[in-house]
Amino acid sequence: MQIILLEKVANLGVLGDVVKVKDGYARNYLIPQGKAKRATQSNMAQFEALRAELERAHAEKLAEAQAIATKLEGLMVQISRKAGMDGRLFGSVSNIDIVDALETQGFKVERSAVRMPEGPIKQVGDSQVDVALHSDIVVPITVSVLGEQQ
């Protein structure tokens, strides 16, 4: 299926690109998420009319993400959990816990923006976690897990 991208999509293209993707990917993900439209003649004409507005909105989102990124740069988030004598946690620290900790510090971040390549944190100590504020902006933060002894 031929689609017009309405925003940058990883491994696919940028705003305004006409690309061919599998029907299911377009129908079930890109179109419902508002990231693309079918590449028909009427949609192409409509897109060209709205192109400047879409580019302006994209630039605003990017500027907002950069402003948040400068505040998040070098930030350390502390989370305390019950832990055993060996430093292993009873449970784990997930992206939901990190989002909650960021919200208490005044940052509004979506759960899907917190990227944990090694999975949930299960040890006491410091860990690096990436926060993807925009498709172009990824900020590393430090999560310090403090163990509460029983």
From Swiss-Prot:
Q: Which UniProt keywords apply?
A: Ribonucleoprotein, Ribosomal protein, RNA-binding, rRNA-binding
According to its UniProt entry, one GO biological process term is: translation
Q: What terms describe the molecular function in GO for this protein?
A: rRNA binding; structural constituent of ribosome
Against InterPro entries, the record matches this protein to: Ribosomal_bL9, Ribosomal_bL9/RNase_H1_N, Ribosomal_bL9_bac/chp, Ribosomal_bL9_C, Ribosomal_bL9_C_sf, Ribosomal_bL9_N, Ribosomal_bL9_N_sf
Gene Ontology, cellular component aspect:
ribonucleoprotein complex; ribosome
**What PROSITE patterns does the entry give?**
RIBOSOMAL_L9
Summary of the function given for this chain in its UniProt record: Binds to the 23S rRNA.
Q: Which family does it belong to?
A: Belongs to the bacterial ribosomal protein bL9 family.
Q: What name is this protein filed under?
A: Large ribosomal subunit protein bL9
What are the leading ranks of the lineage? Bacteria, Pseudomonadati, Pseudomonadota, Betaproteobacteria, Rhodocyclales
Task: Identify the gene encoding this protein.
Answer: rplI
